[in-house]
Amino acid sequence: MKKSLLGLTFASLMFSAGSAVAADYKIDKEGQHAFVNFRIQHLGYSWLYGTFKDFDGTFTFDEKNPAADKVNVTINTTSVDTNHAERDKHLRSADFLNTAKYPQATFTSTSVKKDGDELDITGDLTLNGVTKPVTLEAKLIGQGDDPWGGKRAGFEAEGKIKLKDFNIKTDLGPASQEVDLIISVEGVQQK
């Protein structure tokens, strides 16, 4: 009886220790603590910045075991906003995002590796009907308790994509072939 009680206690401690380490988070879209931004050079003379205003996602974060981390994000591509209505309409057209045919973009991580202070998050990005691997360099900004009794974790990530890789063939000149992704998310831990 003592052995089985000891075994049960040990097993429950192992289970609690493991579950306390990995945590699932929902991106805080409602509180506006998350941003999916981008920039591209305009003719090589300046940077044009934009954002996607409507997206949702989740992530699993285990600080001690990055290989267990996961990220899943869905972006409503019709929500693209560059602070210029005519340009946004053009970006939604078949020349760029083709939102009538592909109203969503998705990112699903396939691996997460620690690289010094950063995490290299590699995953499949589906955009404009094309799926390609993309690596984002992410950094933990902070984590801990919030004033409402919950727990939060925040990250910033950056990456690059080439327009032609996602079947976007509009030629904006040699300086405008790549898009920089600048992402900031805060997640609320799920219970």
From Swiss-Prot:
Coiled coil: none annotated. The keyword Manganese does not apply. Residues 1-22 form the signal peptide. SUPFAM superfamilies: YceI-like. InterPro entries: Lipid/polyisoprenoid-bd_YceI (IPR007372), TTHA0802/YceI-like_sf (IPR036761), UPF0312/YceI (IPR023480). Its main location: periplasm. It is found in: Periplasm. Pfam families: YceI (PF04264). Keywords: Periplasm, Signal. One of its GO terms (cellular component) is periplasmic space. Transmembrane segments: none annotated. Belongs to the UPF0312 family. Type 1 subfamily. HAMAP family: UPF0312. NCBIfam families: PRK03757.1. This is Protein YceI. It comes from Escherichia coli (strain K12). The lineage of its organism: Bacteria, Pseudomonadati, Pseudomonadota, Gammaproteobacteria, Enterobacterales.
